[in-house]
Amino acid sequence: SAGGGLQMMVTGVVQNMTGESAQRAALGAGAIVIDVLAANDGRLPHEKIERIRTMRPDMILMAGGTDGGAVNHVVEMAEYVAAAEPRPRFGVTYKLPLIYAGNKEAQPQVKKILGEKSALVVTENIRPVLERENLAPARNKIHDLFLEHVMQQAPGYKKLMEMAGAPIMPTPAAVGLIMEAIAKREHLNLIGVDI
């Protein structure tokens, strides 16, 4: 993978709920998850801020809260990210891509806190209700931002774009499309394992 693969940090309100959902979305997009921060992860605020600052992820995915639920913990996580002023591993002149996929009621506050400090993109909630995950919109945004922001900083990428006769897509997305095409053509149910 270019530059060692997409390295992401994810956040959630409850570690074993929205934190894990955010992690699944990132992993499903082919990312390497370097840390999962959550309101209940046992770390003090200054420890969370320092961790964000030192990890230098390529991208951050923020999740948390069900739609219509409380917003205070989601806003708190946004404030930690803002206080850390995270810088990307590559391309120090650009803003860090950040995807917000949490409680839609917190969107205005998250935009106010992080809109100027990051390349913020808002998408559908990863867990709109407790009983259901909605990972695809966040996964698709990860792919889009990876190509738009992260890969633009990779050496040789612009030349590759000039040489390619078709749009470039992240490897996990390409593999997924190949598997879907094979399954459809052969009338099979497939499962893929990326090792």
What do these predicted regions represent?
Residues S1-N189:
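Nucleotide/phosphate-binding catalytic cleft detector across ATP-hydrolyzing
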Residues L190-D194:
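Short glycine-aspartate micro-motif
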